[in-house]
Amino acid sequence: MACPIRVAVTQAEPVYLDLAASVKKACGLIAEAAQNGAKLVAFSECWLPGYPAWIWARPVDFELQTRYIYNSLPIESEAMELVKATAKEHSIAVALGFSEQSPSHSIYISQAIISPQGEVVMHRRKIKPTHMERTLFGDGSGADLNNVVEVDFGAEHGKIKVGCFACWEHTQPLLKYHSISQGEAIHISMWPPIDPSAGVDHPGLWSMTADGCQNLSQTYAIESTAYVLHSTSVCTQKGIETLKTQDGLSCRQPGGGHSCVIGPDGRRLTAPLGDGSPDAEGIVYADLDLTKVVATRGFLDIVGHYSRPDLLWLGVDREQKENIIAKQHKAAEQEAVQG
């Protein structure tokens, strides 16, 4: 049996709408996590260059939208190379949440898992952006269903299956079932800054609050019997002023940070950072005993002994759908067959 593996979950504010400064801060957090013994560090949804919370305050903002696109991260870029190099230098895996800029300047809610060797071993886009997110972000495609990858942590810990989802993907039963079928042992649950509930008169949905979102992460842990790294970010008063969200449903007040680690039976394993204030910045650490994943699956394995595929099953199309598909002429097709 491999020894316990230390993981790190960030609870930090990006430099909103500033990709270069946010990447610099991310690299500092990666180094800090590694120096404290972590072998995997998780960031929150769209941490680069920050979650665009103004979408929950007003229907459109051309100025901020344009600025956001320019500061979103292309997967092939110097900024991504810097993050990869930092992971390799410190021999730590990184689960990165970012706004991805495509060559045509469309943007997507994306996630990447970078190995301790500095390679992007998994890159995916959120299958369906949530509600107002669709005013900015495009959809994922079939290949983005592959959200779990085996990460090589070296001789001490071996290869471990790590997966991730963004935010309300944790409400999607079919998507979750497909993810769980891939056998992850560690799951990164990425969220934006999330506000506490104001009670029965809360202006939004309880499922969008800190308690509601943690509930979804804990439910995923129970269903998957995997450890869940519940990663959230922070929005200070400076962030509110940058995003102009003081009158919105999200980031109305400083806070948003509720990061924690959840066990494979759904229990919360870590205390809040500092004094528990949601505007506290830092890193949450936990040492994971992966034998507890196996022990829990002895009771509950919804893609194994606790399933009935003869009665209920899931169909999946993992093909990537492209905008341009070259038509192959009949002569070329015949030549290919004859060859």
Swiss-Prot record:
Its EC number is 3.5.5.1, 3.5.5.5. Optimum temperature is 40 degrees Celsius. One of its GO terms (molecular function) is hydro-lyase activity. It catalyses: a nitrile + 2 H2O = a carboxylate + NH4(+); 4-chlorophenylacetonitrile + 2 H2O = 4-chlorophenylacetate + NH4(+). Pfam families: CN_hydrolase. Optimum pH is 5.5-8.5. Keywords: Hydrolase. The keyword Hydrolase applies. SUPFAM superfamilies: Carbon-nitrogen hydrolase. The active site is at residues 45, 126, 167. The keyword Hydrolase applies. InterPro entries: C-N_Hydrolase, C-N_Hydrolase_sf, Nitrilase/CN_hydratase_CS, Nitrilases_CHs. Belongs to the carbon-nitrogen hydrolase superfamily. Nitrilase family. Nitrilase that hydrolyzes preferentially phenylacetonitrile, (R,S)-mandelonitrile, and 3-indolylacetonitrile. This is Arylacetonitrilase. It comes from Fusarium vanettenii (strain ATCC MYA-4622 / CBS 123669 / FGSC 9596 / NRRL 45880 / 77-13-4) (Fusarium solani subsp. pisi).
